[in-house]
Amino acid sequence: MSDSLPTLSHLDDSGQVRMVDVGDKADADRLAIARAAVRMSPQAYGLLTQPGQGKGEVLNTARVAGVLAAKRCAELIPLCHSLPLAFVGIEFSLDDEGHRVEIRATCRTRYKTGVEMEAMTACSMAALTIYDMCKAADKGIVIEQVRLAYKSGGKSGEWRND
Protein backbone atom coordinates (compact mmCIF):
# COMPACT_ATOMS: atom_id res chain seq x y z
CA MET A 1 0.00 0.00 0.00
CA SER A 2 1.41 3.40 -0.96
CA ASP A 3 2.10 6.01 1.74
CA SER A 4 0.16 8.55 -0.33
CA LEU A 5 -3.11 6.63 -0.05
CA PRO A 6 -5.34 7.30 2.94
CA THR A 7 -5.40 4.68 5.66
CA LEU A 8 -7.59 3.92 8.64
CA SER A 9 -5.31 4.88 11.51
CA HIS A 10 -7.12 2.71 14.07
CA LEU A 11 -6.41 -0.51 12.17
CA ASP A 12 -3.03 -2.25 12.20
CA ASP A 13 -1.44 -3.95 9.18
CA SER A 14 -3.50 -7.10 9.77
CA GLY A 15 -6.76 -5.16 10.04
CA GLN A 16 -7.07 -5.43 13.82
CA VAL A 17 -8.37 -2.52 15.88
CA ARG A 18 -5.71 -0.59 17.78
CA MET A 19 -5.25 2.67 19.60
CA VAL A 20 -2.89 5.00 17.75
CA ASP A 21 0.43 5.41 19.61
CA VAL A 22 1.03 9.14 20.04
CA GLY A 23 3.76 8.73 22.67
CA ASP A 24 6.58 9.97 20.46
CA LYS A 25 4.67 12.90 18.95
CA ALA A 26 5.48 16.43 20.03
CA ASP A 27 2.85 18.57 21.68
CA ALA A 28 1.33 21.14 19.31
CA ASP A 29 -1.40 23.76 19.51
CA ARG A 30 -4.58 22.25 18.10
CA LEU A 31 -8.01 23.66 17.41
CA ALA A 32 -11.19 22.05 16.10
CA ILE A 33 -14.58 23.53 15.30
CA ALA A 34 -17.62 21.31 14.76
CA ARG A 35 -21.15 22.21 13.76
CA ALA A 36 -24.57 20.62 14.06
CA ALA A 37 -28.18 21.71 13.78
CA VAL A 38 -31.43 20.79 15.49
CA ARG A 39 -34.52 21.21 13.29
CA MET A 40 -37.98 21.14 14.84
CA SER A 41 -41.59 21.93 14.09
CA PRO A 42 -42.68 25.57 13.98
CA GLN A 43 -44.69 24.96 17.15
CA ALA A 44 -41.76 23.55 19.13
CA TYR A 45 -39.44 26.25 17.80
CA GLY A 46 -41.99 28.86 18.85
CA LEU A 47 -42.06 27.46 22.38
CA LEU A 48 -38.27 27.40 22.51
CA THR A 49 -37.88 30.98 21.32
CA GLN A 50 -40.94 32.59 22.91
CA PRO A 51 -39.93 35.17 25.53
CA GLY A 52 -40.25 33.76 29.02
CA GLN A 53 -40.49 30.15 27.81
CA GLY A 54 -36.99 29.07 28.74
CA LYS A 55 -34.84 29.51 25.64
CA GLY A 56 -32.05 30.52 27.96
CA GLU A 57 -32.53 27.48 30.15
CA VAL A 58 -32.62 25.03 27.24
CA LEU A 59 -29.57 26.50 25.51
CA ASN A 60 -27.59 26.95 28.74
CA THR A 61 -28.29 23.34 29.69
CA ALA A 62 -27.22 22.23 26.19
CA ARG A 63 -24.06 24.35 26.48
CA VAL A 64 -23.06 22.70 29.77
CA ALA A 65 -23.87 19.24 28.35
CA GLY A 66 -21.64 19.95 25.34
CA VAL A 67 -18.73 21.02 27.52
CA LEU A 68 -19.12 17.96 29.74
CA ALA A 69 -19.29 15.67 26.70
CA ALA A 70 -16.05 17.08 25.29
CA LYS A 71 -14.38 16.45 28.64
CA ARG A 72 -15.64 12.83 28.69
CA CYS A 73 -14.98 12.03 25.02
CA ALA A 74 -12.32 9.39 25.73
CA GLU A 75 -14.84 7.52 27.89
CA LEU A 76 -17.47 7.56 25.13
CA ILE A 77 -15.42 6.74 22.02
CA PRO A 78 -13.34 3.59 22.55
CA LEU A 79 -10.08 4.54 20.83
CA CYS A 80 -10.01 8.26 21.66
CA HIS A 81 -7.08 9.49 23.72
CA SER A 82 -7.81 11.37 26.90
CA LEU A 83 -6.29 14.79 26.49
CA PRO A 84 -5.98 18.07 28.36
CA LEU A 85 -8.57 20.46 27.01
CA ALA A 86 -7.53 24.10 27.29
CA PHE A 87 -10.91 25.40 26.11
CA VAL A 88 -14.38 24.22 25.10
CA GLY A 89 -16.90 26.74 23.83
CA ILE A 90 -20.45 26.13 22.63
CA GLU A 91 -22.32 28.79 20.66
CA PHE A 92 -25.88 28.79 19.34
CA SER A 93 -27.57 30.71 16.56
CA LEU A 94 -31.27 30.63 15.79
CA ASP A 95 -32.62 30.14 12.28
CA ASP A 96 -36.18 31.45 12.52
CA GLU A 97 -37.07 30.56 8.91
CA GLY A 98 -35.80 26.98 9.13
CA HIS A 99 -36.93 26.43 12.75
CA ARG A 100 -33.40 25.36 13.58
CA VAL A 101 -30.91 25.83 16.36
CA GLU A 102 -27.41 25.85 14.88
CA ILE A 103 -24.62 24.71 17.17
CA ARG A 104 -20.92 25.48 16.96
CA ALA A 105 -18.43 23.79 19.30
CA THR A 106 -14.82 24.93 19.56
CA CYS A 107 -12.16 22.88 21.34
CA ARG A 108 -8.54 23.80 21.92
CA THR A 109 -5.55 21.95 23.38
CA ARG A 110 -1.78 21.77 23.29
CA TYR A 111 -1.17 18.07 22.97
CA LYS A 112 0.01 15.18 20.79
CA THR A 113 -3.31 14.55 19.06
CA GLY A 114 -6.20 16.61 17.76
CA VAL A 115 -9.49 17.63 19.32
CA GLU A 116 -11.82 16.90 16.40
CA MET A 117 -13.68 14.14 18.22
CA GLU A 118 -14.11 16.31 21.30
CA ALA A 119 -15.63 19.10 19.21
CA MET A 120 -18.00 16.74 17.38
CA THR A 121 -18.97 15.01 20.62
CA ALA A 122 -19.68 18.40 22.21
CA CYS A 123 -21.92 19.37 19.27
CA SER A 124 -23.72 16.04 19.33
CA MET A 125 -24.43 16.15 23.06
CA ALA A 126 -25.60 19.76 22.92
CA ALA A 127 -27.98 18.74 20.10
CA LEU A 128 -29.22 15.70 22.03
CA THR A 129 -29.87 17.88 25.07
CA ILE A 130 -31.95 20.31 23.01
CA TYR A 131 -33.86 17.32 21.65
CA ASP A 132 -34.43 15.97 25.15
CA MET A 133 -35.70 19.28 26.49
CA CYS A 134 -38.00 19.93 23.50
CA LYS A 135 -39.27 16.42 22.68
CA ALA A 136 -42.50 16.88 24.62
CA ALA A 137 -43.48 19.51 22.04
CA ASP A 138 -42.20 17.62 18.96
CA LYS A 139 -41.26 13.96 18.66
CA GLY A 140 -40.04 14.56 15.10
CA ILE A 141 -37.08 16.78 15.96
CA VAL A 142 -34.14 16.10 13.64
CA ILE A 143 -30.46 16.40 14.54
CA GLU A 144 -28.59 17.06 11.32
CA GLN A 145 -25.30 17.96 9.75
CA VAL A 146 -22.98 16.99 12.60
CA ARG A 147 -19.61 17.66 11.02
CA LEU A 148 -16.09 18.90 11.47
CA ALA A 149 -15.96 22.43 10.09
CA TYR A 150 -12.32 23.35 10.79
CA LYS A 151 -9.15 21.98 12.33
CA SER A 152 -5.63 23.25 12.74
CA GLY A 153 -2.42 22.01 14.26
CA GLY A 154 -0.40 18.85 14.09
CA LYS A 155 1.09 17.08 11.10
CA SER A 156 -1.91 17.56 8.82
CA GLY A 157 -2.05 21.31 9.47
CA GLU A 158 -5.09 23.38 8.65
CA TRP A 159 -8.27 21.94 7.11
CA ARG A 160 -11.66 23.49 6.32
CA ASN A 161 -14.95 21.90 5.38
CA ASP A 162 -16.41 24.62 3.18
UniProtKB/Swiss-Prot annotation:
Keywords: Lyase, Molybdenum cofactor biosynthesis
GO biological process, one term: Mo-molybdopterin cofactor biosynthetic process
Pathway(s) it belongs to: Cofactor biosynthesis; molybdopterin biosynthesis
Catalytic class of the enzyme: lyase
Keyword Lyase: yes
Reaction catalysis annotation: (8S)-3',8-cyclo-7,8-dihydroguanosine 5'-triphosphate = cyclic pyranopterin phosphate + diphosphate
One matching Pfam family: MoaC
Active site: 132
Record bears the keyword Lyase: yes
EC number from the UniProt entry: 4.6.1.17
Alphabetized GO MF terms: cyclic pyranopterin monophosphate synthase activity
Residues that, per the record, bind substrate: 79-81, 117-118
InterPro entries per the UniProt record, alphabetical: MoaC, MoaC_bact/euk, MoaC_sf, MoCo_biosynth_MoaA/MoaC, Mopterin_CF_biosynth-C_dom
NCBIfam families membership: moaC, PRK09364.1
Function text: Catalyzes the conversion of (8S)-3',8-cyclo-7,8-dihydroguanosine 5'-triphosphate to cyclic pyranopterin monophosphate (cPMP).
Oligomer status and interactors: Homohexamer; trimer of dimers.
HAMAP family from the UniProt entry: MoaC_B
Family to which this protein belongs: Belongs to the MoaC family.
Protein's recorded name: Cyclic pyranopterin monophosphate synthase
Encoding gene, per UniProt annotation: moaC
